[in-house]
Amino acid sequence: MDNTSSVPWASAASVTCLSLDAKCHSSSAKSTASSISATPESQTMRHIAHTQRCLSRLTSLVALLLIVLPMNFSPAHSCGPGRGLGRHRARNLYPLVLKQTIPNLSEYTNSASGPLEGVIRRDSPKFKDLVPNYNRDILFRDEEGTGADRLMSKRCREKLNLLAYSVMNEWPGIRLLVTESWDEDYHHGQESLHYEGRAVTIATSDRDQSKYGMLARLAVEAGFDWVSYVSRRHIYCSVKSDSSISSHVHGCFTPESTALLESGVRKPLGELSIGDRVLSMTANGQAVYSEVILFMDRNLEQMQNFVQLHTDGGAVLTVTPAHLISVWQPESQKLTFVFADRIEEKNQVLVRDSETGELRPQRVIKVGSVRSKGVVAPLTREGTIVVNSVAASCYAVINSQSLAHWGLAPMRLLSTLEAWLPAKEQLHSSPKVVSSAEQQNGIHWYANALYKVKDYVLPQSWRHD
């Protein structure tokens, strides 16, 4: 992850970019020669179109490099267990003992799999949210013969598939066995996440009980939200509901939260546009204005659970649990970034001083939660933003501000190159341009792609799962 590791690929990328640029200009020259009689306006439009095609190719190349290269880092660099990608674990994993659960909390707490949301029947509206799992590396017992054991929530399927891969790496020739998933026959008492497709009961295909402690550990590493070595005969795992995990997918603020524009005007995040310059923070904790280059998530209708941080100076920040917040460490005199739901009272966050305009530490005096409508996640060129006077990262899920900022480099490059292009409206007959903020509704495609690959390239200790 250090700077020296990026030199080889940067050189290769530069050569490739030069090649692409040469091809694009060569194509442009041929086109110009074949149409000498064309008007200056048509030549300008053709040049813009060629430049945009070069830009698209270049951006795709850089994005591919930044996604693929972390997969080639050694386990020592990534500090990870090495599951997936066929590597052996770089650190020892200890099996769970009988009756042990991880985390050591009630299954229905928010820090584990969360509360029950209601039984799902075949005639329930939520039944369509269950998805079948046809992974050939998993055996499904399916005693009922209805295929019910293949049905589960999307999050449960994602974690189960990761676990199946880990089982094959740990014990070649052995497959993961699912003995129970979604239950429509009420075999598990009155309260069970099996009825919602959020729980699975698992074993190994050889039924070797000596493997079950390690199987439970692999389930924890795969990202299940609650794992219990409840019986010598099987392992029980469950996950948060799909409706609640969006707070773990991307970090967002409420649309009513405000950012300070360079003009001195406070603007609600729900009204921000691409190109707005808002108050942000440098890596050294200095206040600076930075351009909004895209929205990683924007949905003004989505209901969401938020964490609320109250400071002794009266600032209140409302943010999703997985969002990174700047925290000042007075003992070491260092600035760190911590997930919002892991900030405690007496921690110090950076807040803008209304008199000097500088960012100063203020003590957190209360940490609460609230459910509200709408999510907005602007990305600035600096990778940080000051919201409701509190300094925060633009990133979430990954417990590393620098790594997350590095991962969004292609989008910053794209924004820079687009700024060099002639005005896009020259390519259209209508001069009206609709802002990206008005068009976007949902998660940005690039942010979503990074989220999907994180489980394969980052250790669980780096993720907010």
UniProtKB/Swiss-Prot annotation:
It comes from the Eukaryota. A lipid is attached at residue 251 (Cholesterol glycine ester). The record marks 251-252 as: Cleavage. Its EC number is 3.1.-.-. Interacts with shf. The keyword Nucleus applies. The keyword Repeat does not apply. GO terms for cellular component: endocytic vesicle; endosome; extracellular space; nucleus; plasma membrane. Pfam families: HH_signal (PF01085), Hint (PF01079). Ca(2+) 1 binds at residues 143-144, 149, 179-180. The record marks 320 as: Involved in auto-cleavage. InterPro entries: Hedgehog, Hedgehog_Hint, Hedgehog_sig/DD-Pept_Zn-bd_sf, Hedgehog_Signaling, Hedgehog_signalling_dom, Hint_dom_C, Hint_dom_N, Hint_dom_sf. The gene is hh. A lipid is attached at residue 79 (N-palmitoyl cysteine). GO terms for molecular function: calcium ion binding; cholesterol-protein transferase activity; morphogen activity; patched binding; peptidase activity. It is found in: Nucleus; Cytoplasm. Ca(2+) 2 binds at residues 144, 180, 183, 185. It comes from Drosophila yakuba. Its main location: nucleus. This is Protein hedgehog.
